[in-house]
């Protein structure tokens, strides 16, 4: 995003216990009207793209892009309206990978950014808690692999 405004921070926040089963927010949310270009935070390779709404509408990330970066970190960008990247694509820092939206478990248009340590995150298929009998594939990691995105972005 070219213009940054944080709408929900990483971790335990005043709203996280009410909004998330884990009680913690897995990334940082940034205000972004639908259609705002979303850019990669660093060089890397796209490990996965998807849309959790196809399996379980209004749950999880919705349309997302998952990137493994050359610096050892990984990132996931969620609630996109349109995905412009594809699995296996080499990405440069600042390259447009999609456009912000309001897909998945979202209360309004924004970008959800998650940063993961090392090889902690991977594309994982698991049963949906929100839609019993269905499974979806998305980036997941052990709790210790989730990092605060604001520590890894340029100062706001």
Language-model features and meaning:
Residues 38-40, 44-46, 50, 88-100:
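A structural signal for short beta-strand/turn segments enriched in small hydrophobics and glycine
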Residues 29, 66, 76, 99, ...:
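Conserved beta-strand positions that form and line the central face of beta-propeller blades
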Residues 52, 80, 102-103, 128:
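Residue-level structural signal for beta-strand termini and adjacent loop
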Residues 6, 30, 44, 94, ...:
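Terminal peptide-recognition signature
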Residues 5-40, 51:
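Short glycine/threonine/proline-enriched tight-turn/helix- or strand-capping micro-motif at secondary-structure
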Residues 23-26, 40-84, 108-117:
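Zn2+-dependent peptidoglycan hydrolase active-site motif and core
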Residues 86-95, 114-156:
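Acidic, glycine-rich catalytic/binding loops that coordinate metals and/or anionic ligands
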Residues 11, 35, 51, 70-72, ...:
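Solvent-exposed coil/turn segments that connect beta secondary-structure elements
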């Amino acid at each position: 995003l070219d213009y940054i405004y944080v709408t929900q921070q990483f971790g335990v926040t005043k709203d996280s216990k009410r909004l998330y089963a884990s009680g913690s927010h897995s990334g940082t949310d940034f205000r972004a009207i639908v259609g705002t270009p979303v850019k990669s935070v660093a060089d890397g390779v796209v490990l996965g793209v998807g849309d959790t709404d196809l399996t379980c509408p209004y749950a999880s990330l919705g349309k997302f892009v998952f990137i493994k970066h050359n610096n050892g970190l990984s990132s996931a960008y969620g609630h996109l309206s349109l995905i412009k990247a594809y699995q296996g694509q080499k990405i440069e820092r600042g390259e447009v990978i999609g456009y912000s939206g309001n897909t998945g478990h979202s209360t309004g248009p924004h970008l959800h950014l998650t940063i993961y340590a090392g090889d902690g995150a991977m594309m994982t298929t698991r049963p949906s808690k929100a839609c019993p009998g269905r499974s979806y594939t998305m980036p997941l990691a052990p709790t210790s692999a989730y990092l605060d995105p604001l520590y890894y972005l340029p100062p706001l």
